Every structure is written in structure tokens, then in C-alpha cells.
């Protein structure tokens, strides 16, 4: 799912919100998360997961064109660890896909990640 698809899905799910408001909310949230990680902060969303930074050590790489060895400097990279509730929901969804050959969603409303039923 792309950012545009996420915005469209949220706008469709919550028609009381204007599409531009949904767009603004998603972009603002992603910007805040990016700024927090860039400043070295850890982000934890209970039930969903946590974002943190991992340090990659410097290493010796190879230029694929010339075969020459080059030093690749160390750097910090974002890391995501899924929360227990997200892992369970993904596992459950995988099991549902195996039992429903037509791929249709179940007839009952499925709870969202926070336990609320989708509108």
C-alpha cells in the first residue's frame, strides 16, 4: 500500500473527513515520525510496533563495475519491530486467506488494530 492508497482508504472509510484533511493528517504524522527518528528518538505505538535506529558498522564493499574494494562508511538506519497485536493480526489474516479460496472478507465486521470495528 502506498501513501496515496492509504490516504484514499482512510478517506473512504471515514467520509465525514474531507479528503484534504485526511491527506494532511497522514503527511503530518509521517513528518513527525521522520523528525523524531532523525533526532534519535524511539517511537512506540502500543499494539502496532516500535521504530528505532540501528547502527550499521563500516565495511569493505566492492565496486561492481571495476571490482575495486571501497570502504562503505557506517550509518544509522531505521528499524521497525512489530508489536504482539500486529503480529497476531497478520498471522490471523494469513490463516483466513488459506481458508477462504475466493479471497472475500468474512461477513462479520473485523476489529481494527485498536479493537474498534471499522465503520
Curated annotation (Swiss-Prot):
GO terms for molecular function: DNA binding; structural constituent of chromatin. Belongs to the bacterial histone-like protein family. Coiled coil: none annotated. This is Integration host factor subunit beta. Residues 97-112 have a biased composition (Low complexity). GO terms for biological process: DNA recombination; regulation of DNA-templated transcription; regulation of translation. Keywords: DNA recombination, DNA-binding, Transcription, Transcription regulation, Translation regulation. Heterodimer of an alpha and a beta chain. Residues 93-119 are annotated as: Disordered. Transmembrane segments: none annotated. The lineage of its organism: Bacteria, Pseudomonadati, Pseudomonadota, Betaproteobacteria, Burkholderiales. HAMAP family: IHF_beta. One of its GO terms (cellular component) is cytosol.
Amino acid at each position: 500500500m502506498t501513501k496515496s492508497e492509504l490516504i484514499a482508504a482512510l478517506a473512504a472509510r471515514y467520509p465525514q473527513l474531507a479528503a484534504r484533511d485526511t491527506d494532511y493528517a497522514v503527511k503530518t504524522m509521517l513528518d513527525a515520525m521522520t523528525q523524531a527518528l532523525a533526532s534519535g528518538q524511539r517511537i512506540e505505538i502500543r499494539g502496532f510496533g516500535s521504530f528505532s535506529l540501528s547502527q550499521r558498522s563500516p565495511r569493505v564493499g566492492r565496486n561492481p563495475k571495476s571490482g575495486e574494494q571501497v570502504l562503505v562508511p557506517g550509518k544509522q538506519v531505521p528499524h521497525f519491530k512489530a508489536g504482539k497485536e500486529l503480529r497476531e493480526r497478520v498471522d490471523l489474516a494469513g490463516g483466513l486467506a488459506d481458508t477462504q479460496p475466493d479471497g472475500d472478507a468474512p461477513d462479520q465486521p473485523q476489529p481494527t488494530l485498536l479493537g474498534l470495528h471499522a465503520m
